[in-house]
Regions:
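Generic ordered-secondary-structure signal
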Residues: 11, 15-16, 37, 68, ...
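N-terminal first-folded block
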Residues: 1-27
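C-terminal structural segments of small proteins and small subunits
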Residues: 55-79
Length: 82
């Protein structure tokens, strides 16, 4: 599945989930899926907890997060080299 095809699985609608990016057809925020992955959950763990999702939905969240990281960044204090 191409990157563009994956992103078709993400929806942003002001009337759904407060306009937050979510998985199309579901009220599951992209950020929630990314938080699960960041905390150590595997794709399989997420699919077990959310059986209505498909593997490609989780991959779409990762692709969306990667695109956002290319466009924006979070301020993190610089660490001095030791």
């Amino acid at each position: 599945m191409s990157h563009d095809d994956l992103l078709q699985r993400i929806s942003i609608n002001p009337g759904i989930c407060f306009g937050k990016p979510c998985i199309r057809g579901h009220r599951i925020w992209v950020s929630l899926v990314l938080d699960f992955l960041a905390s150590g959950s595997s794709i399989e763990d997420i699919l077990e907890d959310y059986p209505q999702l498909e593997r490609e939905d989780v991959l779409a969240c990762i692709a969306y997060g990667a695109d956002m990281a290319r466009e924006r960044y979070v301020e993190i204090p610089l660490q001095k080299a030791s």
